[in-house]
Amino acid sequence: MTIRVGINGFGRIGRNYFRALLEQGADIEIVAVNDLGDTATTAHLLKYDTILGRLKAEVTHTADTITVDGKTIKVFSERNPADIPWGELNVDIVIESTGIFTKKADAEKHIAGGAKKVLISAPASDEDITIVLGVNEDKYDPAKHNVISNASCTTNCVAPMAKVLDENFGIVKGLMTTIHAYTNDQRILDFPHKDLRRARAAAENIIPTTTGAAKATALVLPQLKGKMDGISMRVPVPTGSATDLVVEVSREVTKDEVNAAFKKAAEGELQGYLSYTEDPIVSSDIVGDPSSCTFDSAMTMVMEGTSVKILGWYDNEWGYSNRLVDLTVFVGNQL
C-alpha cells in the first residue's frame, strides 16, 4: 500500500526527507506540502542544495503547486495546522517538521484536519511515544499511538550507542558531548538570540550550548533514566556531527571487547542504523551517510576497566531524514 504523506514545514529536514524517500524508492507519495514560503522559493530550494547538490529531477512550480518529474504536489501556506485540508487529500501521515508544533495538543490539529498519524521530526512534549528505530520500535502500539516523535538527530545517534553498552556491559552513569554542526537556529553574524551563546556567529565560533539528547535517551531506554546527561558544542560545519560518550560500566571491560560488541550489533540487530568503521574518518566523510550512527572503533578508550569513552559520527540532516522515512514506512504499514 502506498503511504500518502503531507509535509508541514519544508525546511532543512522537510526537504532532506523528500530527497531521502526518492533515493530510497520508498512506497510513499507526497501529496501536499504546507510552508509559509512562496512556491518559487520552495521549488528552488528543493532543486538546489548546498550540501546535497542539485536534485536529479525536473522541478517546476505554479502559484500553488510544485511538480517533481511529472508528479504534482499541492502547496498550502497555512499558519494554523488545523486549517490544512489533509482529510480532503486522504493523507495518512503528516510529517511535522516546522520545529514549532512539537506539543501534542498542537500536533493533534493535523489529525483533526483528517490525517491518521503525525510524525514529529524533533523532540516533543506529551507525545504518545518517542521512537528511535533499532532501539524501541517494539513498543509502538498503532491503536493508541497517534502523535509520534522521531526524537532528535543526536538521540538517534546516542541511543544505539547506549543500547549496545548497556546490554553488554551495564551503564552505571554517563556524560555525552555532541560536536554538532551549526543549524538555522543560530546566527550567521552576531545577532540577538535568547541563548546568548547562539547569538554569536555560527561559522566563526565553537559554541557551547544545551542538548536534551542524553536525557531523552531514557525515553527509549527507560532503564537509563537519571543516569545520563550532556552538552552540545556547535562547530563551524554545515552538517556532519559526532557524539562523544563517556560512561561508567558495571564490570571491567577492554577496548577490544567494546569494539567487538559494536561490530556485532552493526552487523546484526542494528544493521542499517548503526555502522562500524576502522578507518580514520573526519566529519566530511560522514556527509550523505544514511546511518543513525557510525561507530569509530579507533577512538575507543578504556580506563581502569570500567570507564569507557566512545565516538559515533552522524550526518545530522541526512541520517535523521532517512530514519524519518523509515519510521513513515514502519507506521504506515500498520495503518
From Swiss-Prot:
Pfam families recorded: Gp_dh_C, Gp_dh_N
GO CC annotation terms, alphabetical: cytoplasm
Binding site for D-glyceraldehyde 3-phosphate: S152, C153, T154, T183, R198, T211, G212, R234
Known regulation of activity: Inhibited by pentalenolactone.
Molecular function GO terms recorded: glyceraldehyde-3-phosphate dehydrogenase (NAD+) (phosphorylating) activity; NAD binding; NADP binding
Main location: cytoplasm
Tagged with keyword DNA damage: no
Catalyzed chemical reaction(s): D-glyceraldehyde 3-phosphate + phosphate + NAD(+) = (2R)-3-phospho-glyceroyl phosphate + NADH + H(+)
Active site, UniProt feature: C153 (nucleophile)
EC number(s) on file: 1.2.1.12
Keyword Membrane on entry: no
InterPro entries assigned: GlycerAld/Erythrose_P_DH (IPR020831), GlycerAld_3-P_DH_cat (IPR020829), GlycerAld_3-P_DH_NAD(P)-bd (IPR020828), Glyceraldehyde-3-P_DH_1 (IPR006424), NAD(P)-bd_dom_sf (IPR036291)
Function: Catalyzes the oxidative phosphorylation of glyceraldehyde 3-phosphate (G3P) to 1,3-bisphosphoglycerate (BPG) using the cofactor NAD. The first reaction step involves the formation of a hemiacetal intermediate between G3P and a cysteine residue, and this hemiacetal intermediate is then oxidized to a thioester, with concomitant reduction of NAD to NADH. The reduced NADH is then exchanged with the second NAD, and the thioester is attacked by a nucleophilic inorganic phosphate to produce BPG.
Known partners and oligomeric status: Homotetramer.
UniProt-recorded name of the protein: Glyceraldehyde-3-phosphate dehydrogenase 2
